[in-house]
């Protein structure tokens, strides 16, 4: 039954290569099904190339939505129409199957099923595939070696679920083929179609700021790095050539334009900040690291403060005198 949740992987073979893309890549389809009661349900489906969403499913029109100009890969409109029909039919059957077995499996409404399936590439070669199902956000079952296996922590419910799924070996064979054969060909074709976008280099911008005070006599220094692509980046607070091990990196977050943002913080005593710097390494910089010195940031801040405060005072005095003239 669960092979029906992978129709976006069921694409035709495509040529392609992953030249220039050295980091591990994956293509996966995520299916989230929310069952509020026996008749009310919600369906969310998306396709992802690593961290980049490339496809989604419009439940109202029952169509695949291509989020990038190259998301279609090398396939014709007719081929994608066939996939939409396949997806529509199999999604309905998947809902019916889960709802049919909900009572037998002791699924209590409301509940949520999450499925993620796909394949991985490393240095242009297939390195593995995966298909996992979660129930209520917890690991439940996974597909391995052509059959469904329960997670040990999932208990008897998961064992019974696997027993149901493994009754039809033909469907398991289809699932295995989708993961081990069709998906790798699809991701290679997708990489070829999106090569210009995926291999672009966008230089980061960086700036420094104060963070919330960590306590009396201490400062939080913040180094912001934004607008870079691809995602891998190295950011570190330095004292001379010595890396500061207290550097805390946040998550690398996506921006609306498809680039990335990161901030790195460091807490120090106020008197120890002067000779610190933030260093940024990124492939787009071609070895010319960005280095920002905290003492320069502080000097600029004092200059701005020295200019703005008197200016505000002059404006205030001018408004006060003007008000007195009208009285």
UniProtKB/Swiss-Prot annotation:
Gene3D superfamilies: Immunoglobulins, MHC class I-like antigen recognition-like. Residues 1-16 form the signal peptide. GO terms for molecular function: endogenous lipid antigen binding; exogenous lipid antigen binding; lipopeptide binding. It is a single-pass type I membrane protein. InterPro entries: Ig-like_dom, Ig-like_dom_sf, Ig-like_fold, Ig_C1-set, MHC_class-I_related, MHC_I-like_Ag-recog, MHC_I-like_Ag-recog_sf, MHC_I/II-like_Ag-recog. Residues 17-300 are extracellular. Expressed on cortical thymocytes, epidermal Langerhans cells, dendritic cells, on certain T-cell leukemias, and in various other tissues. It is found in: Cell membrane; Membrane raft; Endosome membrane. A D-galactosylceramide binds at residues 90-94, 171, 175. GO terms for biological process: adaptive immune response; antigen processing and presentation, endogenous lipid antigen via MHC class Ib; antigen processing and presentation, exogenous lipid antigen via MHC class Ib; immune response; positive regulation of T cell mediated cytotoxicity. Keywords: Adaptive immunity, Cell membrane, Disulfide bond, Endosome, Glycoprotein, Immunity, Immunoglobulin domain, Membrane, Signal, Transmembrane, Transmembrane helix. Glycans are attached at residues 37, 60, 74, 145. Antigen-presenting protein that binds self and non-self lipid and glycolipid antigens and presents them to T-cell receptors on natural killer T-cells. During protein synthesis and maturation, CD1 family members bind endogenous lipids that are replaced by lipid or glycolipid antigens when the proteins are internalized and pass through endosomes, before trafficking back to the cell surface. This is T-cell surface glycoprotein CD1a.
């Amino acid at each position: 039954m669960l092979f029906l949740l992978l129709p976006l992987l069921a694409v035709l073979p495509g040529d392609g290569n992953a030249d220039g893309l050295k980091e591990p890549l994956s293509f996966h389809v995520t299916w989230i099904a929310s069952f509020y009661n026996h008749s009310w349900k919600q369906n969310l489906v998306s396709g992802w190339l690593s961290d980049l969403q490339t496809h989604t499913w419009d439940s109202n029109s029952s169509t695949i939505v291509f989020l990038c100009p190259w998301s279609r890969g090398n396939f014709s409109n007719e081929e994608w129409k066939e996939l939409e029909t396949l997806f529509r039919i199999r999604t309905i059957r998947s809902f019916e199957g889960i709802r049919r077995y909900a009572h037998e499996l002791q699924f209590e409404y409301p509940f949520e099923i999450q499925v993620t399936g796909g394949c991985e590439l490393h240095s242009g070669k297939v390195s593995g595939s995966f298909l996992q199902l979660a129930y209520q956000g917890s690991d439940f079952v996974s597909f391995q070696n052509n059959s469904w296996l329960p997670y040990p922590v999932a208990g008897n419910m998961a064992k019974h679920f696997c027993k149901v799924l493994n009754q039809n070996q033909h469907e398991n064979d289809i699932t295995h083929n989708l993961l081990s054969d069709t998906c790798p060909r699809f991701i290679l074709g997708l990489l070829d179609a999106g090569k210009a976008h995926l291999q672009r280099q966008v230089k980061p911008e960086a700036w420094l700021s104060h963070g919330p005070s960590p306590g009396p006599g201490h400062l939080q220094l913040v180094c912001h790095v934004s607008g870079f692509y691809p995602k891998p980046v190295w950011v570190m607070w330095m004292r001379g050539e010595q890396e500061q091990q207290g550097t805390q990196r946040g998550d690398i977050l996506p921006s609306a334009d498809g680039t990335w943002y990161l901030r790195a913080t460091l807490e120090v005593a106020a008197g120890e900040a002067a000779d610190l710097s933030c260093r940024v390494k990124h492939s787009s910089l071609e070895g010319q690291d960005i280095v920002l010195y905290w003492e320069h940031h502080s000097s600029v801040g004092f200059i701005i403060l020295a200019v703005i405060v008197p200016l505000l005072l002059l404006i205030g005095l001018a408004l006060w005198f003007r008000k007195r003239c009208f009285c």
